Amino acid sequence: MSQQRPARKLPSLLLDPTEETVRRRCRDPINVEGLLPSKIRINLEDNVQYVSMRKALKVKRPRFDVSLVYLTRKFMDLVRSAPGGILDLNKVATKLGVRKRRVYDITNVLDGIDLVEKKSKNHIRWIGSDLSNFGAVPQQKKLQEELSDLSAMEDALDELIKDCAQQLFELTDDKENERLAYVTYQDIHSIQAFHEQIVIAVKAPAETRLDVPAPREDSITVHIRSTNGPIDVYLCEVEQGQTSNKRSEGVGTSSSESTHPEGPEEEENPQQSEELLEVSN
């Protein structure tokens, strides 16, 4: 049978009576309230003050101010103003107010797309396109768009002119329309804009030239000249509903160098005719 050994008495440790009292109180949950509340209150006030200081610092330094986008824009402004496009990264970090690591993030990206090259550890040189005309690119694009709009407008006007020329050709040279190429007195009288005005109708051959000199105070002079045949001038009395040939009150006509050959189609030299109209107020 085994014999039980008597329990060995451990040597007692020398403890400070004050420390033993504090430890006993900490282990006892009932005595937790015995801790000094003043110490807890001081710690809470310190924490609140620390948090408020951190918030104040965040307000003073917006996140956008240190973003890569903002720093890259400022970096490009420095590149644009740098002589030869060479920058000292130490000075760049000082001017931007950031660590050099942030500047290296920018230069590494630009170096990867062959826009800068490293001259030394802390110096880079811009090797991209010329930045002196960087601001003129939007203006150049705007001018190109305006030029495209003007070219499109010019093409549209050319089409309208071509269409009008075709309609004029069909009106004057078409055999079906040739017999209807005239206006009657009733047609002129029905136009409201001609009322209370002097209306002069001119019947002249092709390529007839009409010149209107500067009007005088009391009259207007009109020169009509033709080398292909006679010129007939009619005055339409719109108000009275009558027409008169060559003469009317306040209107004078004179004819010179005008002949009526018996066979104009057999004549070698074309017939010349000139009319001078003078309308008095």
UniProtKB/Swiss-Prot annotation:
<dbReference type="GO" id="GO:0000785">
    <property type="term" value="C:chromatin"/>
</dbReference>
<feature type="DNA-binding region">
    <location>
        <begin position="50"/>
        <end position="129"/>
    </location>
</feature>
<keyword id="KW-0678">Repressor</keyword>
<dbReference type="GO" id="GO:0090575">
    <property type="term" value="C:RNA polymerase II transcription regulator complex"/>
</dbReference>
<dbReference type="InterPro" id="IPR032198">
    <property type="entry name" value="E2F_CC-MB"/>
</dbReference>
<keyword id="KW-0832">Ubl conjugation</keyword>
<protein>
    <recommendedName>
        <fullName>Transcription factor E2F6</fullName>
    </recommendedName>
</protein>
<keyword id="KW-1017">Isopeptide bond</keyword>
<dbReference type="InterPro" id="IPR037241">
    <property type="entry name" value="E2F-DP_heterodim"/>
</dbReference>
<dbReference type="InterPro" id="IPR003316">
    <property type="entry name" value="E2F_WHTH_DNA-bd_dom"/>
</dbReference>
<feature type="cross-link" description="Glycyl lysine isopeptide (Lys-Gly) (interchain with G-Cter in SUMO2)">
    <location>
        <position position="9"/>
    </location>
</feature>
<dbReference type="InterPro" id="IPR015633">
    <property type="entry name" value="E2F"/>
</dbReference>
<feature type="region of interest" description="Leucine-zipper">
    <location>
        <begin position="143"/>
        <end position="164"/>
    </location>
</feature>
<comment type="similarity">
    <text>Belongs to the E2F/DP family.</text>
</comment>
<keyword id="KW-0805">Transcription regulation</keyword>
<dbReference type="GO" id="GO:0000981">
    <property type="term" value="F:DNA-binding transcription factor activity, RNA polymerase II-specific"/>
</dbReference>
<feature type="region of interest" description="Dimerization">
    <location>
        <begin position="130"/>
        <end position="222"/>
    </location>
</feature>
<feature type="region of interest" description="Transcription repression">
    <location>
        <begin position="173"/>
        <end position="281"/>
    </location>
</feature>
<dbReference type="GO" id="GO:0046983">
    <property type="term" value="F:protein dimerization activity"/>
</dbReference>
<dbReference type="InterPro" id="IPR036388">
    <property type="entry name" value="WH-like_DNA-bd_sf"/>
</dbReference>
<keyword id="KW-0804">Transcription</keyword>
<dbReference type="GO" id="GO:0001227">
    <property type="term" value="F:DNA-binding transcription repressor activity, RNA polymerase II-specific"/>
</dbReference>
<dbReference type="GO" id="GO:0000978">
    <property type="term" value="F:RNA polymerase II cis-regulatory region sequence-specific DNA binding"/>
</dbReference>
<dbReference type="Pfam" id="PF02319">
    <property type="entry name" value="E2F_TDP"/>
</dbReference>
<feature type="short sequence motif" description="DEF box">
    <location>
        <begin position="95"/>
        <end position="129"/>
    </location>
</feature>
<comment type="subunit">
    <text>Forms heterodimers with DP family members TFDP1 or TFDP2. Component of the DRTF1/E2F transcription factor complex. Part of the E2F6.com-1 complex in G0 phase composed of E2F6, MGA, MAX, TFDP1, CBX3, BAT8, EUHMTASE1, RING1, RNF2, MBLR, L3MBTL2 and YAF2. Component of some MLL1/MLL complex, at least composed of the core components KMT2A/MLL1, ASH2L, HCFC1/HCF1, WDR5 and RBBP5, as well as the facultative components BACC1, CHD8, E2F6, HSP70, INO80C, KANSL1, LAS1L, MAX, MCRS1, MGA, KAT8/MOF, PELP1, PHF20, PRP31, RING2, RUVB1/TIP49A, RUVB2/TIP49B, SENP3, TAF1, TAF4, TAF6, TAF7, TAF9 and TEX10.</text>
</comment>
<dbReference type="GO" id="GO:0071339">
    <property type="term" value="C:MLL1 complex"/>
</dbReference>
<feature type="region of interest" description="Disordered">
    <location>
        <begin position="241"/>
        <end position="281"/>
    </location>
</feature>
<keyword id="KW-0539">Nucleus</keyword>
<dbReference type="InterPro" id="IPR036390">
    <property type="entry name" value="WH_DNA-bd_sf"/>
</dbReference>
<dbReference type="GO" id="GO:0005654">
    <property type="term" value="C:nucleoplasm"/>
</dbReference>
<keyword id="KW-0131">Cell cycle</keyword>
<dbReference type="GO" id="GO:0005634">
    <property type="term" value="C:nucleus"/>
</dbReference>
<dbReference type="Pfam" id="PF16421">
    <property type="entry name" value="E2F_CC-MB"/>
</dbReference>
<comment type="function">
    <text>Inhibitor of E2F-dependent transcription. Binds DNA cooperatively with DP proteins through the E2 recognition site, 5'-TTTC[CG]CGC-3'. Has a preference for the 5'-TTTCCCGC-3' E2F recognition site. E2F6 lacks the transcriptional activation and pocket protein binding domains. Appears to regulate a subset of E2F-dependent genes whose products are required for entry into the cell cycle but not for normal cell cycle progression. Represses expression of some meiosis-specific genes, including SLC25A31/ANT4.</text>
</comment>
<keyword id="KW-0238">DNA-binding</keyword>
<dbReference type="GO" id="GO:0006357">
    <property type="term" value="P:regulation of transcription by RNA polymerase II"/>
</dbReference>
<dbReference type="GO" id="GO:0000122">
    <property type="term" value="P:negative regulation of transcription by RNA polymerase II"/>
</dbReference>
